[in-house]
Amino acid sequence: MKRVFLMATLLAMTLFSASAQEKEKRCIQLPSWLDNLKLSGYGMTQYQYIGQEGAKSNTFNIRMARIALEGRIAGDFYWKTQIQFNGNTSNLGSSPRMVDLFAEWQKYEMFKVKIGQFKNPFTFENPMHPIVQGFMSYSQNLSKLAGFSDRAGEHASNGRDIGLQLQGDFLKNANGRNLLHYQIGVFNGQGINTKDVDNQKNIIGGVWVMPVKGMRIGAFGWTGSYARKGTWNDDEQGNIVYQKDAAGNPVLDEEGNPKKETFSGVRKLSQNRYAFSFEYNVNDWTLRSEYIHSTGMAFAKSITNHGDANSKDCNLNGKIGNKAQGVYALVIAPIVSKKLYAKARYDMYQANGKTDMMRTQYEAGLNYHISKNFTILTEYALINDRTLQKHNYSMADVEVCFRF
């Protein structure tokens, strides 16, 4: 009996070993760079009420839904790709699209090299996660002057472009904390998922000091152009140009109206911007303020689809001219640390650099972090828009956000 039991045990062990070896042969050996592959994502659902006269609305919305893959290769190289998949495919503003695809060599803390599609190195708020940023939208000056819904007429690009960037931290103090950060990059200047049009690159960069823990004081610069290929009928100030005969008299059409001149080719608009930034995170409080100034004309119509007429319309927006500026200041204060926060923001933007087109948002609300990965954002805003006949109206916003 013992002999039979021993033989059965040996047979079972042999079969188990053979089965394990067979399974091992069938397994696909993943490359080492996939060992630390990370999948992440987040969603932001939204309800928003707008009380503007003649344009009142209240609607549920998917503000944002993204999924990302990231990892490291050979220790020194970090890579990431991220897709935004909410919206529809009718236009570039809300259609699914790739927002990030880059690799960065990170061997040295003071000298890192990044290439691909990623955030413009401009302002403190631009690279912030939208849930961490904490309000119903990024500030107006950031949205219009950092590549989101840019005043120049560029398609919605989430503050990003395609290019090459250098950055680093150095000058450590006695506690080993870096006191200085720099970042500078060369970009196409056309926004995400788009090749260069005028072969002139944008140079964008910034530097900030960190005198005490949690504090940053920075300055940023942006110089370059935004271009389109198409047709236009106006001069460099946005004034319509009419045809004239050899004697200098207006050329009229069949109905007796003056005929417009038509120009064609690549039209590029210089863009020169700078920003000053301050941020202080201390004892669970957040204080931040940024001022941005811009010089440069804008196209009259923004691109929503690269195949439609707007993408080839190179006429200028003479109404807003060649200047713009804006500033915001915000505070996020703990009521219950790590859980419940009160917030307030002053957010002002001048589309033409003057008060007659000034739009100001006075905002207040609460943020409740149910857990590390689940947050509810609430907000009320009083809007003063001087371009409207009735300047003042209210907005309310509630967002339920999750991430993994």
Predicted features along the sequence, with ranges:
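Alpha-helical transmembrane segments and their juxtamembrane interfaces
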Residues: 12-13, 85, 124, 300, ...
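Outer membrane beta-barrel
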Residues: 26-189, 197-204, 208-217, 223, ...
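Residues in and immediately flanking transmembrane alpha helices
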Residues: 15-16, 88, 130, 303
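N-terminal periplasmic/intermembrane-space "pro-region" immediately following the signal or transit peptide
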Residues: 1-44
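Outer-membrane beta-barrel pore domains
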Residues: 51-55, 74, 102-106, 117, ...
